[in-house]
Design a protein with these regions (language model features):
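Structural motif
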Residues: 36, 73, 80-82, 89, ...
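Short histidine-centered beta-strand/loop micro-motifs
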Residues: 41-42, 62-68, 109-111
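Short acidic-glycine-tyrosine-enriched beta hairpin
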Residues: 20-21, 80, 87-105
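Tight coil/turn sites that cap or link beta-strands
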Residues: 58-60, 95, 103, 113
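A contiguous, mid-protein "functional segment" used to position or interact
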Residues: 114-161
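A short, N-terminal "cap"/entry segment at the start of jelly-roll beta-barrel domains
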Residues: 1-49, 147-173
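Ligand-binding loop in jelly-roll beta-barrel domains
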Residues: 46, 82, 102-128
Length: 173
């Protein structure tokens, strides 16, 4: 019988407990891809291990096809989301968890007639910083997205394309 010992590092007392409520006034809410994304837990809070985002996706909302070099996991809290993964389409409803492997092409869309809500965890962290770089701040999770002209929408897409590589992401549009 082998004696396997694992040494667990000491507690890092500089790291604090994180309690996040998406409706708290100090949360950062961003309008992205037609939805409202609330950054619940940042990479800074987890020493880069992961980030967690609450996504409110309206009917018809969702990002374009893309891929990145990190894992992305979604848990559906409300509604139904249609995922496209390597060209295959899959619908996921309340309670389902969908894991997207690193580097795999994918997208998602809310095809229903009501808003959907999901949690998105990325590991390692970094997607939170991408969202903060490309999103438009909004006052709350339920605030409407800003009314953008066609030129402003085009500028947002160009900004996302320009910054994607910095955040280990490739937009496939």
């Amino acid at each position: 019988m082998s004696d396997i010992t694992t040494t667990i590092p000491p507690d890092d007392a500089s790291r604090k407990l994180t309690v996040a409520n998406p409706d708290d006034a100090d949360m950062r809410h961003l309008s992205i891809a037609g939805g409202t994304y609330t950054i619940l837990v940042t990479g800074e809070q987890t020493a880069g291990r992961y980030c967690l985002t609450d996504m409110l996706v309206p009917s018809g909302g969702g990002p374009p096809p893309h891929r990145h070099d990190f894992e992305e996991m979604f848990t559906i809290l409300e509604g139904e989301i249609e995922f496209t993964f390597r060209g295959e389409v899959l619908s996921a409803g309340v309670g389902a968890t969908v894991n997207i492997p690193a580097n795999a092409p994918h997208s998602f869309k809310n095809k229903s007639n009501k808003a959907a809500r999901l949690l998105c965890m990325c590991t390692p962290a970094g997607q939170d910083e991408f969202f903060l770089s490309v999103g438009d701040p909004v006052a709350s999770r339920s605030a409407p997205p800003p009314k953008l002209s066609d030129a402003e929408r085009f500028e947002r897409v160009q900004r996302a394309k320009a910054l994607a590589g910095k955040y280990r992401t490739e937009l496939l549009v």
